[in-house]
């Protein structure tokens, strides 16, 4: 794989992504790097090497489009774009969409769209569906205003509501799959 997990835009820059694992400050003219793992609120980080392996193994030979119903970080979109594929991601937070779209601007066919996945169905058919969905009440996802957007799965008050919205997002994604393609759900 050409995408290493320790280098690349997924390391974040100036807090632009939820995958920031280090923070740099300047004190007395010296750059100090803090690499503790809690700088991003202990958000999980999707491994770009795993993304590349998934795209290369599960994309059909003539496939061109990847859809991610629970967008999150930049990794899968950046890797898909780098491999020459179109990529669309549904993401409920505008700040995450803006950060990821800025990081992937060199790939014109890679886009994060602000939408509630449980209510959104893409207009095109897709050759690979990939999801690394949120876990119930494990992480807190916030937008520019410091609040979780309405419909953000981790902010729902019951597991049943979380499950139902998650599964509706999956159903919407399944409805736009081309025949003989894969839906990959990555957990853990």
Please annotate each region the language model reported.
Residues 125-169:
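Mobile active-site "lid"/loop adjacent to the S-adenosyl-L-methionine
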Residues 43-47, 71, 165:
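Short secondary-structure boundary/capping elements
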Residues 39, 43, 89, 154-161:
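Pocket-edge positions in alpha/beta enzyme catalytic cores
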Residues 1-60:
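S-adenosyl-L-methionine
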Residues 48-120, 128, 173:
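Conserved S-adenosyl-L-methionine
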Residues 69, 133-134, 179:
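Proline-centered helix-kink/hinge sites
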Residues 62-63, 170-172, 177-183:
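Short glycine-dipeptide loop
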């Amino acid at each position: 794989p050409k995408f290493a997990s320790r280098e690349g835009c997924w390391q974040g820059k100036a807090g632009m992504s939820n995958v920031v694992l280090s923070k740099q400050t300047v004190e007395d003219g010296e750059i100090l790097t803090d690499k503790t793992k809690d700088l991003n609120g202990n958000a999980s980080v999707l491994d770009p090497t795993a993304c590349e392996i998934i795209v290369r193994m599960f994309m059909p030979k003539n496939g061109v489009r990847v859809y991610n119903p629970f967008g999150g970080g930049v990794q899968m979109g950046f890797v898909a774009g780098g491999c020459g594929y179109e990529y669309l991601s549904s993401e409920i937070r505008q700040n995450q969409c803006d950060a990821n779209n800025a990081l992937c601007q060199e790939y014109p066919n890679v886009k994060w769209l602000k939408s509630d996945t449980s209510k959104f169905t893409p207009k095109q058919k897709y050759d690979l569906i990939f999801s690394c969905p949120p876990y119930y009440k494990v992480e807190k996802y916030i937008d520019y205003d410091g609040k979780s957007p309405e419909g953000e799965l981790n902010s729902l008050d019951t597991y049943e509501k979380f499950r139902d919205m998650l599964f509706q997002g999956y159903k919407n994604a399944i409805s736009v799959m081309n025949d003989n393609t894969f839906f990959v759900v990555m957990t853990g």
